[in-house]
Amino acid sequence: MANPRNEAALAELKARFAETDTVVLTEYRGLTVAQTTELRKALGFDVQYSVAKNTLVKIAANEAGIEGLDDLLTGPTAVAFIKGEAVDTAKVLKKFGEENKAFVVKGGYMDGNALTAEQVNAIAELDNRETTLAKLAGAMKGSLAKAAGLFNAPASQVARLAVALQDKKDA
């Protein structure tokens, strides 16, 4: 690999793998430049979507300690390097794939595990972090209100009992 362009591309891929939390591999065969540009815009700033040679991706991934991608690196491959919320990116990729039949999610890598295409699509079905935290906070708030009601119930029962006893003595 004496080609300086390959060496520069490999160095860039290594840096991206080092900075990335999650990686999704896709097949872009049949997409126009306009469609690819549209996808990059939809992915946003937390995702770098790049076309790279499979051999360079294999080398960079292996040197970064990422295993399990070799079987996915066949045919034309583009890599989505995700720095932020993987769920949001998976949703964008899934929606784009539904709108553009030529686009295929091959699989990926997240939290030390290789992912199949089905697993990436399953991630797209999850709620993102903010929504999950909001649901959790709502559930906790409801539970706290119930607990407060339970703690106040004996005190109000004692007060009603005292009033009933007083009424009985007065009668």
UniProtKB/Swiss-Prot annotation:
Any one annotated GO CC term: ribonucleoprotein complex
SUPFAM superfamilies: Ribosomal protein L10-like
InterPro entries according to UniProt: Ribosomal_uL10, Ribosomal_uL10-like_sf, Ribosomal_uL10_bac, Ribosomal_uL10_bac_type
A Gene Ontology molecular function term of the record: large ribosomal subunit rRNA binding
Pfam family for this entry, one: Ribosomal_L10
Keyword set, alphabetical order: Ribonucleoprotein, Ribosomal protein, RNA-binding, rRNA-binding
Keyword RNA-binding appears in the UniProt entry: yes
BP-aspect Gene Ontology terms: translation
Cited PANTHER family: 39S RIBOSOMAL PROTEIN L10, MITOCHONDRIAL
Its job: Forms part of the ribosomal stalk, playing a central role in the interaction of the ribosome with GTP-bound translation factors.
Record family assignment: Belongs to the universal ribosomal protein uL10 family.
Subunit structure: Part of the ribosomal stalk of the 50S ribosomal subunit. The N-terminus interacts with L11 and the large rRNA to form the base of the stalk. The C-terminus forms an elongated spine to which L12 dimers bind in a sequential fashion forming a multimeric L10(L12)X complex.
Protein name stated in the entry: Large ribosomal subunit protein uL10
Species name: Corynebacterium glutamicum (strain R)
The organism's taxonomic lineage, starting at the top: Bacteria, Bacillati, Actinomycetota, Actinomycetes, Mycobacteriales
Gene assigned in the entry: rplJ
